[in-house]
UniProtKB/Swiss-Prot annotation:
NCBIfam families: UDP-GlcNAcDh_Arch. It comes from Methanococcus maripaludis (strain DSM 14266 / JCM 13030 / NBRC 101832 / S2 / LL). Pfam families: GFO_IDH_MocA, GFO_IDH_MocA_C3. This is UDP-N-acetylglucosamine 3-dehydrogenase. Keywords: NAD, Oxidoreductase. Its EC number is 1.1.1.374.
């Protein structure tokens, strides 16, 4: 039985704990403990799931753990992840993998050195609509991809305290586009600004234009300005086009003669992601989202930020 823990139980960390708790019913996973600096929150959630509470995450290292989810603010990812990795414990780190390229490289190097599974929580790769679109792309149903256009907009949230819209929102679509293009970004240009939230140092609007090594172009619009939340991706190919709605998990494909709504078995992407991580640790498989994938997405996001600042 795989013994797991979660460090950081804010909104996203709570969902990691909830899903591990659900997976316990299959008998393959045991949620050993939770850790958070907020003791009231920690005690509340630990009591809900009937597991040990650790106010200091380092105390979890004394437990017989196989894997851990790291769901803390991005600037703490390296600090929290490395002690677990060095002890041979596999790690699922929420996106982005780290706050800097240097820290991401250090996490990846330690994971390789200690032969542990490292996966990054780019959860949209596990969205059933994205996986179905990937099938159509690989079968050539859209022909050669020419452009991909994503929109990820919505109101301001208090959930994210340490990142603007590029590192928090756009990084999702940066990764999905790389996944669908099966290529790395070659050039990136971005415009970004803070429109409505002057007390926040991070950008609340960004427009990113990228070119991949295989000549596919990508356009991403993200903001925390729009009252209505939208999460969409459109693809133009030489044989057809595709419209994807991330939230509704809908996918529609068109060519000159037909319109097709893809049949999709709708599932919670995060549950698919965590179940996949568990399977990779149990069976020593390479995860769908590797540390290198996380690094590539982070690099593109950071270069977009630099571009938006005129660098």
């Amino acid at each position: 039985m795989l013994k797991v823990a979660v460090v950081g139980i804010g909104v996203m960390g709570y969902n990691h704990a909830r899903i591990y708790n659900e997976l316990q019913k299959d008998g393959n996973v045991e949620l050993v403990g939770l850790s958070d600096m907020n003791k009231d929150r920690l005690n509340e959630v630990s009591e809900e799931f009937g597991v040990k509470a650790f106010s200091n995450y380092m105390d979890l290292l004394e437990e017989d753990l196989d894997a851990v989810s790291i769901v803390v603010p991005t600037f703490l990812h390296k600090e929290v992840a490395l002690p677990f990795i060095k002890k041979g414990i596999s790690v699922l780190i929420e996106k982005p993998i780290a706050d800097t390229i240097e820290n991401a490289n250090e996490i990846i190097a330690e994971a390789e050195k200690n032969n542990v599974i490292l996966s990054v929580g780019h959860v949209e790769r596990f969205n059933p609509a994205v996986l179905k679109l990937k099938e159509h792309v690989e079968k050539g149903n859209l022909g050669d991809i020419v452009t991909m256009t994503a929109k990820r907009v919505g109101p301001m949230t208090t959930r994210i305290a340490d990142a603007g819209v590029i590192l928090d929102l756009a990084v999702h679509d940066i990764d999905v586009m790389a996944f669908l293009a099966n290529s790395k970004v070659k050039h990136v240009h971005a415009l970004a600004k803070n429109v409505k939230h002057p007390n926040n140092n991070a950008e609340d609007y960004a427009l990113i234009i990228s070119s991949f090594e295989n000549s596919i172009d990508g356009i991403i619009e993200v903001n925390r300005l729009t009252p209505h939340k939208t999460r969409t991706l459109n693809i133009v190919g030489t044989k057809g086009i595709a419209y994807l709605d991330y939230m509704n998990q809908d996918l529609t494909l068109y060519d000159e003669e037909w319109v097709k709504t893809a049949k999709i078995n709708k599932e919670e992407p995060l549950k698919k992601e965590i179940a996949h991580f568990v399977d990779c640790v149990q069976n020593n498989k390479q995860p769908l989202v590797t540390g290198l994938d996380g690094l590539n997405a982070l690099e593109t996001a950071i270069y977009a930020l630099k571009s938006s600042n005129g660098n």
